[in-house]
């Protein structure tokens, strides 16, 4: 098994066999990831084994209202919205869960966010976990909750 490093989703990647156990995450990868990438609305990165996707995450950009952010993030921003990178989706195939692939992809997303922040104004990485299980994973990884919404997490 030669698992790849995270790389940008390409036509060579095989998506049809991907199953993370969550139908909406499976469907988004299969039906929307390439379209979002070609339109520029999100960039998807995949981990694959012989081009068969076994994990993916998608990044996009957005903003959060100043009053919704922790003091550490809003300091010096006045009343302007806070620019963030959004970890829109992260999923690992059922057969590969529990091997650290999800943590590795999150680390890669954080690294990419840091690289982006060297070029443009970004204050944090924001996640929107899809369910309580994902939210619990985010809290275990030392991400910080968005004060106004319990299922949104910051990394800064």
Question: Which ranges hold each PLM region?
Answer:
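Short amphipathic alpha-helix that is part of the acyltransferase structural core
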Residues: 1-35, 39
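Conserved beta-hairpin
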Residues: 40-61, 68
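Short hydrophobic/aromatic beta-strand element in the GNAT-like acyltransferase core
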Residues: 42-46, 56, 84, 89, ...
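Residue-level recognition of the GNAT/N-acetyltransferase active site
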Residues: 88, 93, 130
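Conserved acetyl-CoA-binding loop-helix of GNAT-fold acetyltransferases
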Residues: 98-112
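Conserved active-site alpha-helix within GNAT-family acetyltransferase domains
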Residues: 114, 120-122, 128-148
């Amino acid at each position: 098994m030669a698992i790849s490093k995270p790389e940008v989703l390409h036509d060579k990647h095989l998506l049809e066999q991907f199953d993370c156990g969550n139908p909406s995450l499976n469907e988004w990868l299969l039906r929307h990831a390439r379209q979002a990438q070609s339109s520029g609305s999100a960039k998807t990165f995949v981990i694959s084994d012989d081009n068969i996707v076994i994990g993916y995450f998608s990044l996009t950009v957005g903003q959060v209202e100043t009053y919704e952010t922790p003091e550490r993030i809003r300091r010096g921003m006045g009343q302007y919205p806070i620019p963030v990178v959004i970890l829109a989706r992260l999923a690992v195939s059922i057969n590969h869960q529990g091997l650290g692939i999800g943590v590795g992809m999150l680390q890669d997303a954080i690294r990419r966010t840091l690289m982006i922040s060297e070029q443009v104004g970004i204050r944090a990485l924001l996640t929107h976990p899809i369910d309580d299980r994902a939210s619990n994973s985010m809290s275990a990884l030392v991400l910080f909750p968005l004060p106004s919404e319990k299922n949104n997490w910051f990394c800064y």
